[in-house]
């Protein structure tokens, strides 16, 4: 055996002029973090980062009814936490979320029910728990706070939100206390949008994007598409339906003979579709921030009353907001489209 500078435990009677090793020798293996030996400033930097390293749990889901926005927001946050131990916790019944996380180099665990999730937390012992699952229950949050976790929630209007240490809500601005951070300033933009320059507005409108995914319960995709076709628009129309659209087969079969209409269930990079569009029809959800970041002219049609309450989708931020989609006629949509399409200065 050869001494390597590590910590050596021995007995007094084994210490001689030529050796400190006895006959019964064993090695105690330590972790990489514990084995850092500080000899240089670089070693000191590494050791300092190990000491600051935290265990962070992301509780997040993605499925047809809620889409993938929650998952990609957490992935964006995780990409900035490279010096910490990050683990995603995903409901095993939501395969879409599992499929997404498997495409990234992050550890994840699946659970079924609250008790299963809390058991995984007991083993992982996170310092911070980030919930991006919408509304949380009071009982769930009590279980987390009783374990001493620091809790951060996103877009939580549930009964458990008051027990969180921080709550971020970029979409629905409202009066709140000091631990609630609301407004568009707190929206986390997907990394792909930083790769694009702002849209260059042209005189002609040749490409329209329709995106009411993932939960188009009012079938606004077809309503807008029918209006565009009735208006005489002959340019390209891309329609993103999402993987869970109930009328997908019906829509495709109805319009498959039209060469200028293309349907998509999922897309690799939504920003590419947006930047290529001259006008976008979409809902009053988080997608508004993505459109705004690119500067593409946008007509907002709300899918529910909650979207109607959002303050961001207004002319002040460059949007034409038509309100609740269920109240709009085809003529209303045609009229508004023609106004936007024919007014170059308005689109600028």
Regions found by a protein language model. Give the residues of each.
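Donor-nucleotide binding loops and adjacent catalytic segments primarily
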Residues: 94, 206-276
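Acidic donor-binding loop of glycosyltransferase active sites
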Residues: 275-286
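A nucleotide-sugar donor-handling region in carbohydrate enzymes
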Residues: 24, 28-46, 164-219, 244
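Active-site donor-binding acidic/aromatic loop of nucleotide-activated sugar
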Residues: 111, 259-266, 321-324
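Short hydrophobic beta-strand element within catalytic cores of glycosyltransferases
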Residues: 280-282, 297-306
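Conserved core of the sugar-phosphate nucleotidyltransferase
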Residues: 1-26
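Active-site and donor-binding regions of nucleotide-sugar-utilizing enzymes
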Residues: 63-65, 73, 77-80, 90-177
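Conserved donor-nucleotide binding/catalytic region of nucleotide-linked donor-dependent transferases
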Residues: 325-348
């Amino acid at each position: 055996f050869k001494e390597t500078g590590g910590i050596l435990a021995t007995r007094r009677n084994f210490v001689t002029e030529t050796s400190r090793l006895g006959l019964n020798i064993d090695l105690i293996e330590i972790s990489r973090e514990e084995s850092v030996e500080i000899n240089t400033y670089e070693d000191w930097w590494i050791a300092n980062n190990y000491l600051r390293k935290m265990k962070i749990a992301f509780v997040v889901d993605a499925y047809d009814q809620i889409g993938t926005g929650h998952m990609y927001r957490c992935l964006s946050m995780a990409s900035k936490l490279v010096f910490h131990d990050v683990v995603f916790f995903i409901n095993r019944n939501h395969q879409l979320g599992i499929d997404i996380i498997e495409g990234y180099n992050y550890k994840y665990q699946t659970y079924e029910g609250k008790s299963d999730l809390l058991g995984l937390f007991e083993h992982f012992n996170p310092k911070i728990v980030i919930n991006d699952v919408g509304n949380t229950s009071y009982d769930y949050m009590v279980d987390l706070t009783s374990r001493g976790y620091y809790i951060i929630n996103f877009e939580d209007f549930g009964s458990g939100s008051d027990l969180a240490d921080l709550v971020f809500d970029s979409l629905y601005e409202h009066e709140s206390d000091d631990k609630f951070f609301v407004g568009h300033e707190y929206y986390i933009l997907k990394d792909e949008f930083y790769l694009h320059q702002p849209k260059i507005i042209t005189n002609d409108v040749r490409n329209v994007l329709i995106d009411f995914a993932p939960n188009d319960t009012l079938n606004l995709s077809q309503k807008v598409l029918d209006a565009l076709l009735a208006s005489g628009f002959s340019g390209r129309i891309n329609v993103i339906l999402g993987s869970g659209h109930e009328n997908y087969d019906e829509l495709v079969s109805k319009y498959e003979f039209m060469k200028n209409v293309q349907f998509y269930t999922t897309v690799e990079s939504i920003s590419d579709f947006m930047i290529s569009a001259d006008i976008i029809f979409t809902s009053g959800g988080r997608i508004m921030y993505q459109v705004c970041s690119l500067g593409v002219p946008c007509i907002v049609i709300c899918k529910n009353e909650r979207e109607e309450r959002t303050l961001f989708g207004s002319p002040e931020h460059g949007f034409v907001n038509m309100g609740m989609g269920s109240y709009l006629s085809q003529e209303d949509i045609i009229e508004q489209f023609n106004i936007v399409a024919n007014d170059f200065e308005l689109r600028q």
